[in-house]
């Protein structure tokens, strides 16, 4: 992760004060505190515990005040939302790693000194104001940075208390939306991605900027989406704090702030009713697909095209899926007079993929056989050439490795060559040579929640088969589920072109794809520009496409259908 360097840096550990509301704490705060225990460059030295005047009210008085201020239906809608959320957690959040996001922890479980303050909520607006005595109390602690662990927005002197200001994690896309309730509105609006931003606020005006932004595929339900974005974002809060001590307090190079002063908006009863209908429709469609034995099924097509920029995809020649299987992730290659297409060959019966190869000759094609078959899943057969030798880097994420295989006899005989990385959650790797270095692009899951579609990481080495790759200074170089995961890679003269996948709502894998030109790549910089977008509209009834391959006039693409499968 890259953080702009500034003049003011510190050599000791960064002292952090964590601002939390009084009461039980959510799993995200627990996760950050736990990660801080192994931090090298920072420590959470104090919990700044906020208590508000209205928290002294009993339950009946609080309900009366809310009804008087906001109307009768607001507390009813809140109660309904809690009920929906609890049901979704029970039914849909099965993974213990995700479910832990909703665990609650008493303040006494955190063995960190606690400083109690009573900020003032203004009658209008969202900016919490701290009283002078509380500000002096915090100043006396010698804290370097405050970390915001609650939902409010700050104003006034609290922004000047620490040299590094306040670091705040904002869920949602504050660039375009002013509605609150993190992770809900993205599901309700069926948006393909759910975003978060980590920003730093400095000075009375709250100036500063965004330290980083990221997005992940939007999950089908509110509870799933909230768990996933919570787990993903807290990993990067920890990493950011690790790097902040050496980066300094300067705001030079920060992204434009995504802060909005629009008031938070919780869903009304009408919105919640519509949300339930949408969720039931998704569940009903999935039940119908199961009962009718329908499943997602990929297919592959190819064609000849003088230029990759203007293929007539609708005229692609489709390779029929074999019984009980599907073909995906095509990579075409020419050697001599032989034209072939390597594919992921997935078997529904074994629930595992292998690598197969088809020979192509004009409108005709036929299966040559299996290229690689391992006791684990294989896909994405990326091929590259070094000194007239061919190597394949297929996806081997099931065993937590990035592996390399060498061609013994083209195109069918390949053997294991070397493991480039171990103990990594990485998929769809591209390897290429540029400016005296070998580069490796792959998508990681830093949070261990199974999201391998959002973070593009770059590495470099002096050797293509090194097992010691240096990470790029700005990793992840792309943090966006609509453009991070690779779907191919090829050259057009001196131009480097990376195919990227665009994930859809409900974690629809490979809804569409695009092609980006890599304009600049070195150990400190990564810059790419989208030059083409391809939608799933070139074959009837398809719902996705996610791999594009081009080699010397031969082009291949894949597509996704929902159809009956006999396993």
Question: Whereabouts are the PLM-identified features?
Answer:
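Loop/turn-rich, solvent-exposed surfaces of beta-rich toroidal or solenoidal domains
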Residues: 437-465, 481-517
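One-carbon transfer enzymes
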Residues: 2-378, 382-391, 401-407, 418, ...
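Beta-rich, blade/repeat-based domains predominating
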Residues: 328-331, 379-384, 427-432, 485-490, ...
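Trp- and S/T/G-rich repeat-edge/linker motifs of beta-rich repeat architectures
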Residues: 365-367, 412-417, 469-473, 523-534
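Short loop/turn segments immediately following beta-strands, especially the blade-tip
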Residues: 407-411, 461-467, 517-527
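Residue-level signature of beta-propeller blades and closely related beta-rich strand-turn architectures
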Residues: 345-347, 396-398, 444-446, 502-504, ...
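Conserved blade-ending motifs and adjacent loop-strand segments that build the rim/top face
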Residues: 473-488, 524-546
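Blade-level signature of beta-propeller repeat domains, shared across WD40, Kelch, NHL, RCC1
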Residues: 512-518, 539-567
